[in-house]
């Protein structure tokens, strides 16, 4: 085997290596023996067709790909080790034309651990915004959300729908001769402020099992001009009518939902939680400002393949959270009025920045020689266990390989703490100068 490094650019290594033909020939024979039972050719019993006959019938390259798969991981690993490359991620591999008896020529490119050049770590200036003051209306809003979350639902089997009820329907829609995909299990809230689809107001009096034909003239100022003023025809099947009962905000509600004795105590607890959340948001803004300035002072180039992997992981995680709450990414983007392309660009930027932070902090860890004591690691494991709803008892043993993640995170916290301690932080006093 020969391996030659062509270049390392933008944290991606490009290199060539060779594979001895005998290694490939042995893999071809193994592949043939494994697969010959699957081939049947006239004049031979199934499973006993000679390799030369199979190759003449199905082409000389019939076993090439599987044979390459059989040897490539090990041969690639040897090449990487001989070049002393610190690789991350999966490689792109291209095998040259294969000639019998000649060693195989392979081209490979793979992300490598980015080189980080640290700049001045001390003296990063940030303005610390003030935490937003929690007002009574903020507490009221939380209580309203808790009221709705803890609502009492009664199935109205035969009673007609009234204002305040939720009606579950399936519906078809036709507009200007175009039929749209049927919608299943749409929940319509019969209330003056909710007329999302345009037919909710006409569901009053409907009962389970009713099939309604509803026409709705779309407003002339509809955001989609091509359908403004046109008539939408809905065929609606009522599947369920439910009465929603909102519990009063009294001491009984506080005891049931807040696990405290009085509503006064509950409001105080909510205020405390809101203040903590506001302080955390300010802290996050401060940390992001420090990282943003750090990126300007340090040099690191993240491979696009790594950014793609991180961005896809972030998208999958976010989509999973939405689905767990009964939503979808498309619906979320509609609600926040954002285009898919713009959202994905933001995710890409977030992924790139998170990777930059990871590698810069890793470099600081090495430069400063940060370590984690046994006591710190045990406490970190207990804290991490609680964060994933695991008992903290014997957390270090239970977490297994995740202990390495905990240890690394603790070192990264120390690295960031160094930046924080040596930053120049000014409080935003709210003054505006012309």
From Swiss-Prot:
Biological process according to GO: 'de novo' cotranslational protein folding; cell division; chaperone-mediated protein folding; protein transport; protein unfolding
PPIase FKBP-type domain segment(s): 164-247
EC number per UniProt: 5.2.1.8
Primary localisation category: cytoplasm
PANTHER family associated with the record: TRIGGER FACTOR CHAPERONE AND PEPTIDYL-PROLYL CIS/TRANS ISOMERASE, TRIGGER FACTOR-LIKE PROTEIN TIG, CHLOROPLASTIC
Domain remark in the UniProt entry: Consists of 3 domains; the N-terminus binds the ribosome, the middle domain has PPIase activity, while the C-terminus has intrinsic chaperone activity on its own.
Identification of the protein by name: Trigger factor 2
């Amino acid at each position: 085997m020969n391996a030659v490094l062509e270049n390392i650019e933008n944290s991606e290594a490009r290199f060539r290596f060779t594979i001895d033909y005998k290694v490939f020939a042995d893999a071809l024979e193994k592949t043939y023996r494994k697969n010959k039972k699957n081939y049947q050719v006239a004049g031979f019993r199934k499973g006993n067709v000679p390799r030369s006959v199979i190759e003449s019938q199905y082409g000389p390259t019939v076993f090439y790909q599987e044979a390459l798969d059989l040897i490539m991981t090990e041969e690639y690993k040897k090449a990487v080790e001989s070049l002393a490359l610190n690789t991350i991620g999966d490689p792109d591999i291209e095998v040259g034309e294969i000639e019998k008896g000649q060693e195989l020529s392979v081209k490979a490119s793979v992300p490598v651990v980015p080189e980080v050049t640290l700049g001045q770590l001390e003296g990063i200036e940030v303005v610390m915004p003030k935490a937003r003051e929690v007002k009574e209306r903020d507490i009221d809003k939380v209580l309203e959300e808790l009221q709705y979350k803890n609502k009492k639902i009664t199935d109205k089997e035969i009673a007609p729908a009234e204002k305040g009820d939720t009606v579950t329907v399936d519906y078809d829609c036709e507009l200007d001769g175009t039929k749209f995909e049927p919608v299943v299990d749409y929940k319509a809230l019969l209330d003056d402020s909710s007329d999302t689809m345009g037919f909710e107001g006409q569901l009053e009096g409907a009962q389970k099992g009713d099939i309604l034909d509803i026409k709705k003239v779309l407003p002339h100022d509809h955001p989609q001009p091509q359908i403004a003023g046109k008539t939408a025809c809905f065929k609606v099947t009522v599947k369920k009518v439910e009465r929603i009962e909102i519990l009063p905000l009294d001491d009984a509600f506080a005891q049931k939902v807040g696990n405290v004795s009085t509503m006064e105590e509950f409001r105080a607890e909510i205020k405390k939680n809101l203040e903590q959340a506001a302080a955390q948001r300010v802290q996050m803004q401060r940390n992001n400002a420090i990282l943003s300035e750090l990126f300007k002072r340090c040099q690191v180039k993240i491979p696009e393949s790594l950014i793609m992997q991180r961005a896809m992981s972030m998208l999958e995680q976010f989509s999973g959270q939405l689905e767990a709450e009964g939503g979808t990414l498309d619906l979320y983007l509609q609600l926040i009025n954002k285009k898919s392309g713009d959202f994905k660009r933001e995710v890409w930027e977030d992924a790139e920045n998170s990777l930059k932070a990871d590698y810069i902090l890793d470099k600081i860890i090495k430069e400063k020689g940060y370590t984690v004591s046994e006591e710190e690691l045990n406490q970190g494991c207990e804290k991490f266990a609680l964060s994933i709803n695991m008992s903290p008892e014997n957390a270090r043993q239970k977490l297994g390989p995740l202990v390495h993640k905990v240890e690394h995170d603790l070192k990264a916290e120390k690295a960031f703490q160094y930046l924080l301690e040596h930053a120049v932080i000014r409080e935003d006093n709210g003054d505006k100068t012309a």
